[in-house]
């Protein structure tokens, strides 16, 4: 009888050891599979440095990454107004890789002495320093003379100018500094390479941009017939008016 008890007791102890060992194997395996993060790397960003996106998302402190999930990182990063979406994955070691897709910034917008950004989808975004906007034209004087006139039409006019100039000559586009919409009227363009404004009318934007390209090339080749010019007028079809200064006219 005692022998049976001892065998039974031994069997119970053996089973307990087997169960305990199996439990340790399972939990240990799960622990070893836990993803440990101590770094987040942001790529494909041009508007802002990676650290600014992380700061906005509240992910600057790497000591708080322990309980993060990839979904949480994606959700936090995508809250930034500059971003369309973010693709997030684990590198298999200790780093979270974040590839961001930024919105297309078409121009800067000056309204009530405040500078904002305009996307190609007509979305207005706040300007977060240190955003680089040197090559963005500034759209100004947007408000319409008519109270019921939607500013969207003025923005689309400015966008047509930007697109037309971009298609005609990238160097001209890079030097486009400002588009003064004049409250819904014809636009006044300011270029960093011209000492005078350019009046740009609505309609035939591509043709006018090509004319502007030819004038720009003359300036680039030091063939400058516009040295004493007050303005260029491209508001009319098949005509270019050159406004001369009064002193130049008096000397003729």
Segments and roles (model prediction):
Residues 99-178:
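Extracytoplasmic segments of membrane-associated envelope/inner-membrane machinery
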Residues 27-131:
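Terminal hydrophobic membrane-targeting helix
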């Amino acid at each position: 009888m005692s022998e049976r008890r001892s065998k039974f007791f031994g069997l119970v102890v053996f089973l307990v050891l087997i169960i305990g060992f199996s439990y340790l194997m399972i939990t240990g395996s799960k622990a070893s599979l836990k993803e440990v993060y101590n770094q987040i790397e942001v790529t494909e960003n041009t508007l802002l440095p990676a650290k600014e996106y992380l700061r906005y998302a509240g992910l600057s402190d790497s000591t708080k990454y322990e309980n993060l999930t990839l979904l949480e990182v994606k959700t936090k990063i995508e809250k930034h107004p500059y971003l369309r979406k973010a693709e997030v994955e684990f590198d298999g070691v200790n780093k979270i890789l974040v590839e961001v897709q930024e919105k297309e910034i078409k121009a800067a917008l000056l309204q009530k002495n405040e500078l904002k950004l305009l996307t190609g989808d007509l979305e207005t975004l706040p300007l977060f320093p240190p955003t680089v906007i040197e090559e963005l034209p500034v759209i100004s004087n947007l408000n319409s003379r008519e109270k019921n006139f939607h500013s969207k039409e003025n923005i689309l006019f400015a966008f047509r100018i930007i697109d037309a100039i971009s298609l005609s000559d990238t160097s001209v586009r890079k030097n486009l500094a400002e588009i003064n919409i004049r409250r819904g009227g014809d636009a006044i363009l300011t270029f960093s390479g011209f000492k005078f404004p350019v009046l740009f009318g609505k309609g035939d934007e591509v043709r006018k941009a090509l004319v502007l390209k030819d004038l720009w090339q003359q300036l680039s080749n030091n063939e400058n017939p516009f040295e004493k010019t007050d303005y260029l007028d491209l508001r009319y079809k098949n005509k270019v008016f050159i406004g001369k200064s009064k002193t130049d006219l008096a000397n003729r």
